[in-house]
UniProtKB/Swiss-Prot annotation:
Domain of life: Bacteria
Gene from which the chain derives: ybeY
Enzyme Commission number(s): 3.1.-.-
Family: Belongs to the endoribonuclease YbeY family.
NCBIfam families with a match to the protein in the record: rRNA maturation RNase YbeY
Listed InterPro entries: MetalPrtase_cat_dom_sf_prd, YbeY, YbeY_CS
Primary site of residence: cytoplasm
PANTHER family membership: ENDORIBONUCLEASE YBEY, CHLOROPLASTIC (PTHR46986:SF1)
Subcellular locations according to the entry: Cytoplasm
Free-text remark on how the cofactor is bound: Binds 1 zinc ion.
Protein residues bound to Zn(2+): 121, 125, 131
Annotated protein name in UniProt: Endoribonuclease YbeY
Amino acid sequence: MTRGPIFLNVGISYGLPRTKLPAAVSFRKWVAATLQGRIRKADLAIRIVDEKEGRALNYHYRNKDYATNVLSFPAQLPEPFPKALKIPLLGDIVMCAPVIAREATEQGKSLSAHYAHLTVHGTLHLLGWNHEDHQEADAMEQLEREILANLGISDPYLGEY
């Protein structure tokens, strides 16, 4: 098993006041737990947005006219990218704070646990995981459960059917 990451750069930016948002160190911990044993170097950005920005991004990139909880944008480096200059850029994660807060309340979850789950979920998308069909969804959800359990966070899918 690969130990790591040995290099982790997670940039956090906020498109709204930081009230009731997890600290940057929490996001870094959740990303590191997701990458543990999978990748040793990573550079990614997380942006926390309001509903207006979240809706605009979801519409622009997915043609869906509503704000969603998390969007992931894997890095697309031009080919061929010189090996000597190659950076371990995974991509960007956008999280919509009002949607996440609303979901946490509706689902009876702590806000921190819900952010942790969606950070893990978004990071897995950057690593190539998807949930386009039941088999992919089951595999991704199981991995999310394992990562969150290692963080001391209970199964986010309990009670769903």
